[in-house]
Amino acid sequence: AWQYFALEGVVTGGNYRKQGCCRPYEFPPCGRHGKEPYYGECYDTAKTPKCQKTCQRGYLKAYKEDKHFGKSAYRLPNNVKAIQRDIMKNGPVVAGFIVYEDFAHYKSGIYKHTAGRMTGGHAVKIIGWGKEKGTPYWLIANSWHDDWGEKGFYRMIRGINNCRIEEMVFAGIV
């Protein structure tokens, strides 16, 4: 994603039906989150529409005018200190990791995979780190709404490459 951002650029985008941004296509919400209305069933696989390369009707900028580009993209080494240095210098990083069944049931605390089969992969944003009762962790923003985990965030054990999270870290310069 970072490389695409640097080479191809991305438009402003935004939440479903948000105004004042370029949305070449929309994905409606699904399921139920907190006190929001029920939006219909969520499906495991949603077909990605072909990008129209146009903004929605009524938006004042052309697609090409709305594009923003990153300056560079890079992969970080599988090294806690290198990841921490990059976050301190450039801000959050993106990490891919292997998802197991127990992750879907996370509510709070420091997540460490203990049970269940692999269900796929996922990308998240590592925004910081800390320690709780001597256990080091990454502080991570997830994309599964604020009714998941710790208000949309979670903590994952740091320093043992849990679910391979420390070997699949990417970042870029905006």
From Swiss-Prot:
Secretion signal span = none
Q: So what EC number does this one have? A: 3.4.22.-
Keyword annotations for this protein, in alphabetical order, are: Disulfide bond, Hydrolase, Protease, Thiol protease, Zymogen
Keyword Protease tagged: yes
Catalytic residues, chain numbering: 122, 142
Q: What is the protein's known function?
A: Expression of the protease correlates with blood-feeding and suggests a role for the protease in blood digestion.
Annotated protein name in UniProt: Cathepsin B-like cysteine proteinase 3
- Origin organism is Ostertagia ostertagi
The protein's gene is named: CP-3
